[in-house]
Amino acid sequence: MKKIKLYDYQQKMLEDIINVLTSAATSTFYNENGKKKKVGSSVMVQMPTGTGKTYVMAAVVKWFLDNHDTGEVWIVAHRRELVEQMQQTLDRFCLDYGEKEMELKAKVRIRVLSIQWLNRHIDELEGAECTPGLIVVDEAHHAIATSYQDLFERNRKALKLGMTATPCRMNKKSFRKLFEILLKSPCTNDFILRGYLAPYDYVVIGKYSNDQLTVNQLKGRGSDGDYAIKEMDEKLNIPQTIQRLYDSVKKYADGKKGIVYAIDIVHAQAIAACYNALGLKSVALDSKTPAKKRKEMVEAFRRSEIDCLVNVNLFDEGFDCPDVEFIQMARPTLSLAKYLQMVGRGLRINHENKDKVCMIIDNVGNYRKFGLPDKPRNWESMFAGLRAGKGIIPTYVKKMQNIIAVNDEMITVKKANTARKKMTARQLKEYLKNVEPFQQDGRWGLRVMDDIIVKPIYTHISDFRGDYAECRIGIQKCLYGLLDRRGNIILPPEYKYIYRWNEHAVEVQGNDGYSRTIEL
């Protein structure tokens, strides 16, 4: 078993996970029909795409095996590709696991399983006395599904660890029934500043472009709450739109190789056909593409024999290819998780190209619903089910029904600061000390010199006192909240007054007129 070397932020996350799994296990109870039953502790971990969740997962597995003489480790995922990726990670660290899912009677400590196979064979596993002491769920934002809930219910005493970049659901469902605690890593922008994620440029279609107006008019919704596939295909899978997709790649990512996210396989094939006809070597892939062919195409992409992988829901989770140089979104979405998973594929650093800057080409205006990829997110609220992981359609869209498209020029909304040097943890701490509020066009944001931390969207932001500043929204009826120096919303702006605060608590008055103290 090889020693697992972790970066400082991964080591801290490992220590935090172990602390939760060991300290809470003896005090947590499951209440059923008035009866309390002791269960193992559980924790969900949020780390941005590309920051090494699988390394942390492997380190937790090693910790469990080193400190527990009994109990298997079950690593569970919802897709075969993710299972294979986790097996490769375990191989890298010489962690032995069952070679085949079918080997129920094999005396192994680690099993890597798809949730579909596990549901079919759970009785056989129990009959063979294969009992998990630790259950690890990869891409754990899917754990809200009944199949995972059944797995947790049947193994109450096992420790549970969920790993995800996006602890949120479009339907606003809470994860608290599955995981007691959410542990968060530093925000995406911190990882970019420290050189653990790649910087990026971001271009988006214009507010009054043909394609943005088309997306604005999409009315249908699928069973998952996202845009209806059929309507997206009818409105966006047309020659003029696909030509504009090619034109934007040619203008902003010429000579680069990347990933395109399409609506469905028909759309993907149409894009690939257009790109190939115009000299951009491309292939269309989806979940029905044979696994062998998918692997061959990805390897050809790594060797630069293919310029563009046009995919459908295939590379938004678990795809690890650091030499992706551009991301093109040709499909709109209302899902925050899908948006961040798509753009996150391009932010992995490439050790062979340390000057990598990923170009994100947004041909469907997802930026207008979600903001930039490194925008601070209130993960705690989404984890608890207080906020949906869903894009907010701007209010002006409802007033644009009769607007005529002006032009199809794209707009640069972010340009990477390539002159800035990568920071150590200490340098980042000093950098954040210089964050200050600024005013632009009557609105307030946060910045460090020319670096915009938060775009000017607030009615006012006060000077920082300690690590927090007061933010205000509204004009006649103002509501107050707190921001930290990274722009994270520590206290949502929904209070009538904020009297005072320190690093531990804040005194507020709610709209009900009552004053209260809230722990931070």
Question: Residue locations for each model-derived region?
Answer:
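Conserved pre-motif I regulatory segment
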Residues: 1-46
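Conserved RecA-like P-loop NTPase helicase motor core
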Residues: 287-383
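Residue-level detector of conserved, function-critical positions
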Residues: 420-520
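Conserved interdomain linker/interface between the two RecA-like ATPase lobes of SF2 helicase motors
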Residues: 182-259
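A conserved SF2-helicase RecA2
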Residues: 189-198, 352-406
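Conserved helicase motor
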Residues: 79-81, 99-106, 114-120, 142-145, ...
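Conserved Walker A/P-loop ATP-binding site and its immediately adjacent core
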Residues: 55, 69-90
